[in-house]
Amino acid sequence: MTHLSDLDIANQSTLQPIKDIAASVGISEDALEPYGHYKAKIDINKITPRENKGKVVLVTAMSPTPAGEGKSTVTVGLADAFHELNKNVMVALREPALGPTFGIKGGATGGGYAQVLPMEDINLHFNGDFHAITTANNALSAFIDNHIHQGNELGIDQRRIEWKRVLDMNDRALRHVNVGLGGPTNGVPREDGFNITVASEIMAILCLSRSIKDLKDKISRITIGYTRDRKPVTVADLKVEGALAMILKDAIKPNLVQSIEGTPTLVHGGPFANIAHGCNSILATETARDLADIVVTEAGFGSDLGAEKFMDIKVREAGFDPAAVVVVATIRALKMHGGVAKDNLKEENVEAVKAGIVNLERHVNNIKKFGVEPVVAINAFIHDTDAEVEYVKSWAKENNVRIALTEVWKKGGKGGVDLANEVLEVIDQPNSFKPLYELELPLEQKIEKIVTEIYGGSKVTFSSKAQKQLKQFKENGWDNYPVCMAKTQYSFSDDQTLLGAPSGFEITIRELEAKTGAGFIVALTGAIMTMPGLPKKPAALNMDVTDDGHAIGLF
């Protein structure tokens, strides 16, 4: 049986005018800034805050296979299912990055009949937010180099500039570059490098800001580097926070689109969860909470990455508690964690599912540590067998875990009604949400708590560089920031080949980065890179555009 591709399904779908989608949740035309017929930005200053804000449902997942487990698909499908049940609901998603779109994953707007549209536009540039973030980031780099070239009044040590340029592409050749070459007229030579745009602190700041004033304040606190006597230099010292915020004045506005079934969806911000905090913007989530009774959102990768950062970074900053958490599981991921090779994941193997269930179990237990009841969603794939699915259901029953088989890829919202009903039962109950750690703990203790309680490790080792940074950060007054771990998404450890639910391992912190504008400290583990590379056969090889301008092969 031949199945339509996600792109084919998207192209066959009928979109409603964006003003009608807006009207369905009470957004006036006055608050709407259309980008064509089917996309718009929202002027948040024209949205009336409400006292009883909508409840937030977070969607996370077990440790994924390289192809991903359909977290965005389940997020959209669950919201469509709430729509089926006549609930007032909105979706809040991250915007896909171009680099992974051309690399390994293809597009990232859901799949099958649980997609957000217009899919082509969202995956390719969308409303220009990533361009604005990239421009603001690189403008700051230009201001830094110009300041040094023009006499360096602040005494910036060009050997200790922490700020890097960015590009929305996977490009390993740009990880380390030299700039300012070619003689005195071209600036002062120094080592530099590029990160991918979604790892930019500007991206994190945009996603954690509540207003333009807040955005400007956070930008002003960015530490760009150090003087020759090791004193931090900030954007405020350069006096360019106003210019950078101006570049972002439209990008800070949430983007409104729709699901195939017409569920209003806000797509805004896109930090990765393995190298950044992995959540969509606070402004989009809070705007949705002012417009809907239920807001379904997601955080990147598993509970060890996006969900932990959602709880310990985003929720602290935003000031709301999650009402429920969905953990997406797939039979193929369970088999992978049970020892099955990638090429054999389509074959029935109940024993491998049994062996791999330990990975899902740890993710479920991680959510419980935050005081929220998890609901497992088995995201159905066509190669799953009844025996494999029944084993997972029996495991859930034995362990008193809520679970639902979810067929939203195939059936849209109707395929997610069972999941929606389970989530509704959790939403109606009080929870005892709490972050994993107190901010007053020293940085090393916060890192150790994440490693031992969420990852299952036994010890954290800090490189000599990281040890020096811990001391310096404490002296600078940065000890009370939350921690943003940069770690492989494929394993609880910092070794991506260590699957299942390993324990007793050590994690090495090789380096720390102070994101004083965004307000967190990044701890880099293992070989994690903030500028990814492309695979040997990138997804781009299967992409094209027709003579009349329609994309081909975009997932």
Curated annotation (Swiss-Prot):
Binding site for ATP: 65-72
EC number of the protein: 6.3.4.3
Keywords: ATP-binding, Ligase, Nucleotide-binding, One-carbon metabolism
Annotated CDD domains: FTHFS
GO molecular function, one term: formate-tetrahydrofolate ligase activity
Catalytic reaction(s) noted: (6S)-5,6,7,8-tetrahydrofolate + formate + ATP = (6R)-10-formyltetrahydrofolate + ADP + phosphate
InterPro entries given in the database record: Formate_THF_ligase, Formate_THF_ligase_CS, P-loop_NTPase
First-tier enzyme category under EC: ligase
One Pfam family here: FTHFS
Pathway(s) where this gene product acts: One-carbon metabolism; tetrahydrofolate interconversion
GO BP term (any one): tetrahydrofolate interconversion
Claim: Ribosomal protein is one of the keywords in the record: no
Top-rank lineage group of the source organism: Bacteria
Keyword Transmembrane helix: no
Family: Belongs to the formate--tetrahydrofolate ligase family.
Protein name from the UniProt record: Formate--tetrahydrofolate ligase
